[in-house]
Amino acid sequence: MNYTKILQGILDIGEAMLKSGAENFRIEDSLYRMCRSYGFTRYDVFVIPSNIQITIETPDGEILTQIRHIETVSTDFDLLHHLNKLSRYVCAHTPNEKELHQIGRAHV
């Protein structure tokens, strides 16, 4: 499993949530849940209105960190509703890195 790509896909969804006006706490909670569903042994998520940071520890003991700077934010409740459903889908089905990347990139 390519954990870097998985992390990118999770971060893509978080970025789309932040750009759509989701609350920081809701984004953190969604990202925590997605990280947990992939079996990461540790995951730290930090969200502020212009930045998302995620550090994970893989089951192999590798530590990865990715950071995104978000420049534009608006409010789109329809997209947020879709992204929340998408987050639940990811947690329930843990799509592979290719599918997750396609899902996440479709909304960034």
What are these regions (language model features)?
Residues 102-104:
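Short, compositionally biased segments
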Residues 106-108:
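Conserved small/polar residues in nucleotide/adenosyl-binding loops
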Residues 1-95:
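Soluble N-terminal domains of membrane-associated systems
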